[in-house]
Amino acid sequence: GLSEQQRHAFLHWVKHFRLANPRQLKRLHNSYNLLRHFYGEDGASAKPADNIGDLVKTLEFPLMITLFALEYLNSLDDPPLRTQLKSSLRGRTKLAFEDEAQPKIRQSLINPAVITLVNRAMPGSQLHLVDAVEPFVLPAIEQNVEAPANVA
């Protein structure tokens, strides 16, 4: 099961990413446990955090946050925004959070702290966190919106 610190972090990041569906939460819990068993314990430092504030400041569980960030992205209804935010998690694009032309990005829950945490390789590996975690996340539903054909 989850340690006390992991439970506190789980609740914090569920609230941060506004994930509330009970089935979704159960799936995320199970996916996180699978990630921990597959890759090993999730990046907890040797010195445990003293309280939830320290835990959040140190962003102690990168697999968990990557899992939740990808879940959040895959739930977005705006495919171009989803693509741009996912690219930022991989460090491929720099988001202009201060740019008035991009209000959707500023309103996104993918903030600079999340990007900084997720844009890294797995410990002891060259595998990017996003690439490591993505197979454990329910994929986004992609819809091709085409103009209806003229029916005569």
PLM feature spans:
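The feature marks long, low-complexity, polar/acidic/proline-rich intrinsically disordered regions embedded
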Residues: 1-152
